[in-house]
A protein has these predicted regions:
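Short beta-strand segments
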Residues: 19-20, 98-99, 127-129, 190-192
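Flexible, glycine/proline-enriched loop segments at strand-loop-helix junctions
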Residues: 21-25, 97-106, 158-166, 196-200
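Internal, conserved structured core segments that host functional sites
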Residues: 92, 100-152, 175
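Catalytic cores of processing enzymes, dominated by hydrolases/peptidases
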Residues: 134-216, 220
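A conserved C-terminal secondary-structure "cap"
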Residues: 197-299
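N-terminal short beta-loop-beta anion/metal-coordinating cradle
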Residues: 1-99
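Conserved active-site and cofactor/substrate-binding residues in soluble primary-metabolism enzymes
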Residues: 26-33, 104, 108, 112, ...
Length: 299
């Protein structure tokens, strides 16, 4: 049985596909959170899904039990779903894919995504991801990425040469290799998230990816509630950093580097005395947030 299931075979106009995957390409969970927000924001309806049975080890990615609105207990399985938003004011419709990087049979899974792209006659495919980087939390979220399509690269300010990275890759890398081999228009776009702040969710990162997604498809981004959440998050981060000398010193170092470099480094910078590990900084930051949530009387 084919693991790709269509609830409705949509007739679409030159659709743009925005894809997000949880896992390797989802630092701080911002990409998939942005994908889910876009589904609601654009009132997209599910049109297809991939059966998880072949692709996940349920010991590692366990299904979740919950109660629905009718008070009935349900089991929710790991999902890779596609949602359609028809846009009569644009020249193209929009498909949003929100899923989880599979554990097994990556080539088979990639083949199913490619089958979906071809059956829906997708005009352009964009993956929205997030990676950990040594960037200032207070600066606007920096995006990196590339496209093999010169027009897409020019429109979005992306590299045309692609990344020179060599080493382990994720589903996003595998999928873009398949798209390139089929000569299909695509772009890979990454939000650079500060590795020393591992708090989830990260409203500032989610807002940035949502804005980028709306920019790609040509829609306005009027998001006052998300903007307020992002400002509040930055305030809480600043308070946390002020409480910890090691994190504060690291941020000061980043501020000095920002004055000397135009692009963020994606490897930890040395502190004044010794390198401070990302795990150490993240642990200190998380401890501060837990104390803030408990309140002073419980500390």
């Amino acid at each position: 049985m084919d693991a790709l299931h269509f609830e409705d075979m949509p007739t679409l106009r030159q659709p743009y596909l925005l894809l997000t995957f949880g896992g390797w390409s989802d630092a701080a969970d911002v990409a998939t959170a942005a994908g889910r927000f876009l589904v609601q924001h654009l009132q997209a309806e599910r049109c297809a899904w991939i059966d998880p049975e072949e692709f996940f080890s349920f010991n590692d990615q366990r299904p979740q039990a919950h109660y629905n609105e009718a008070g009935e207990r349900e089991v929710i399985w790991p999902a890779n779903e596609f949602f359609v938003s028809r846009q009569p004011t644009l020249e193209h419709d929009i498909i949003i894919g929100v899923g989880i990087e599979p554990h097994l049979k990556w080539r088979t899974f990639t083949g199913l995504v490619m089958e979906f792209i071809k059956r829906c006659d997708v005009y352009q495919t964009y993956t929205l991801g997030a990676l950990w980087a040594d960037v200032l939390y207070s600066a606007p979220v920096h995006f990196s990425g590339s496209s093999t399509d010169p027009q897409v690269a020019s429109r979005l300010g992306l590299s045309r040469s692609g990344s020179r990275y060599e080493g382990p890759t994720g589903m996003v890398g595998v999928l873009h290799d398949a798209l390139r081999r089929q000569q299909l228009s695509s772009a890979s776009i990454w939000a650079n998230m500060p590795y020393y702040i591992s708090a989830r969710p990260n409203p500032k990162g989610i807002l940035a990816v949502v804005r980028r997604g709306l920019e790609i498809v040509g829609l306005p981004a009027f998001l006052p509630e998300m903007e307020e959440e992002a400002r509040d998050f930055d305030t809480r981060v600043a308070e946390a950093i002020a409480e910890d000398p090691k994190i504060a010193a690291h941020v000061k170092n980043l501020e000095r580097q920002a004055g000397r470099a135009s692009q963020p480094s994606q490897r930890p910078a040395a502190g004044s005395e010794r390198p401070v590990s990302g795990e150490e900084l993240a642990e200190q930051f998380e401890r501060y947030l837990r104390e803030q949530r408990r309140g002073p009387e419980q500390n």
